[in-house]
C-alpha cells in the first residue's frame, strides 16, 4: 500500500527450502517452506527495511480482490456478548457520518478493558477479554472488530509492528483494526492507544481475526510428534539511528 514502501525484504530458514508461491486475494505474498527433516528445531528469519508515511489512518493503494463485505462475518474470536453490545447501545450515526461513529466506538473500546501484559492468550475471545476486564492489543482489536461488525461495518484484524517509543531497544508485534468506510476505504484504528495509525506503524497482514491474520501456518503429514512455535520480533526506527 502507499502508506509504506518496502525497500528490502528477505526470508531465510535454517532447514528445508523456501519458494515464493503466489499473491493471495488480499495482496499477501505467500511463501512455502518445505522441510523433510523434522528433528530438532527450525528457525525462520524474516527481515527488511520499510519506509512509512502518515496517511491519517486511511490505508491507500491496497492490491485486493476481496469484497469488503466479506469482513462482516463474525468468528469465534469476535462473537459479540451482552457487554460488547451495550458499548454502542446509545450511539447513533448522525447524518450518516460513519467516520465520526468509528472514532467514537474506537474510543469506547479503548476504555472497555485495561491493558495488562500476559493477561490473555492467542485463543482468548473478545467475549472473554471484556468479561475479565483486561487484555492486550489483540483483545482490543477483537472487541472493536466485533462492535463494528455488529453495527454493519466491515472490520478486520491487522498484524504488524509499532515503534511506540523511539528510544526503546526492542519493539515487538502489534495488532489493530481496519474498518471500511464508504468513500474513504479502509481506515486503521488502534483501540489500545485510542487513535488512528501513523508513520510509526508497519502493516504486515490482515484477516478476520488473529488466527486468520497469522503470518506463519504449518501442515504436518505422517508426523505424530509434538510441536510448538516460539516467535520473537524486533522493529527499529532507522531515522533515529541515522539510516534514512
Protein language model features and the residues they cover:
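A mid-sequence, solvent-exposed acidic-amphipathic segment
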Residues: 104-157
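A structural signal for short, well-ordered beta-strand segments
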Residues: 46-48, 177, 233
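Acidic low-complexity segments
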Residues: 43-116, 125-131
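Intrinsically disordered, low-complexity N-terminal segments that are enriched in acidic
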Residues: 1-55
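Conserved small/polar residues in nucleotide/adenosyl-binding loops
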Residues: 231-238
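Short, surface-exposed linear segments at secondary-structure transitions and domain or protein termini
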Residues: 17-19, 68-70, 196-203
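Hydrophobic alpha-helical segments, chiefly the membrane-spanning helices
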Residues: 242-244
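Hydrophobic/aromatic-rich core segments of domains that either
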Residues: 139-224
